[in-house]
Amino acid sequence: MRKDSLSKSGKRRGFVSVVSPFYNETDIIVTAATRMIESLNRGFADWEFILVDDGSTDDSLDKLKGCISELGNPKIKVLSYQPNMGRCRALKTGIDAASADIIITTEADLSWGEDIVERLHDALADYPDRDFVIASPHLAEGGFNEVPFSRVCLSQGGNRLIGWFFDSGVSMHTGMTRAYRRSVIQPLKITSYDKEFHLEVLLKLRTLGYRVAEIPTVLSWEVRRSKGTIQPKSNLFTRRMMRTISSHLLFLAIGQPMRYFGAVSVITMLTAIGFVFAGLWNFVTGGVAANFILMAGLLALFSVVFLGFSVVFTQLRELSAASWSDGKGSAADHMPVRAWQLEKISK
């Protein structure tokens, strides 16, 4: 038995599934896939590598198929569909196709670390009390390397802002590099395949009582920078990120209604009480109190409305939570997905 197929606890690493989506990655797909395969061969006795082509319009898929043919390894599976539907759709498609008890989702180019798959696997396999693990560059021992400063600021600011609104217990809410137990993630019903996907998964798993942990990691874009595949920041990018953050916060408000609508209700009612005291003071001192009392009444009415929203949305969430665990295959929505493995490609 190879020592590198053992975890730090000395246990033999079991079968693992790695899911990596890609879209128009013609410049790096072969290098990225090769690096991941080498890492899996070093760290695991048995594995499967699922690459999901999210409707690429360049020759990424053809290059990848040629690479797999040369490597001659049947452990690699390629899923493909058209048209492009977003990375999150690709992730759920790959997750639903995975067969190992532990499923790891990450970029194929190992930008989260050469040993990220082993570390995520061990953080889950060696700790039975954990249900999923998130890799975070925002922890004390994590960081960024060759990542544009603007993206670092957006990641740190966005995740910190979400953390203020969402009592998740983690520092990284939006990253895709995670490890899940198959019994936890495959049945999860997903309704959003935009940027809210990662947040929806986190929110639903936490609501259902599943336990999460984090490991520190350094996110490096050295390979992407060397290949010139990093897109420069633009005003459009900034606006898109602001829309993403806004939609994340709206999603959290709906997902945790008592926390937000309830808080607004309390604040509004306290303000109404303040207007009542102001009106009484005006009345005692000979001033006009009617305007203050009228405003207090309106605020009290709004407070009751917000409280009603929180109760209704909480009940709706509790009712819908019962159906969150029957969602395997929901990502595909019966869309045609083509699958390739070595024996099919080499014909």
Where are the model-predicted features located?
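Hydrophobic helical membrane-anchoring modules
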Residues: 1-14, 196, 200-347
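Acceptor/aglycone-binding surface of glycosyltransferases and processive sugar-polymer synthases
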Residues: 75, 81-97, 102-105, 114-195, ...
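A conserved acidic beta->alpha catalytic loop
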Residues: 53-62, 110
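N-proximal low-complexity "stem/linker" segments adjacent to membrane-targeting elements
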Residues: 1-38
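Short beta-strand/loop segment that forms part of the nucleotide-sugar
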Residues: 45-55, 77-80
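Donor nucleotide-sugar binding loop of glycosyltransferases
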Residues: 25-28, 56, 87, 113
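Short helix-capping segments at alpha-helix termini
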Residues: 40-45, 69-75, 126-128
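Acidic helix N-cap motif at the loop->helix transition within catalytic regions
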Residues: 27-31, 58-67
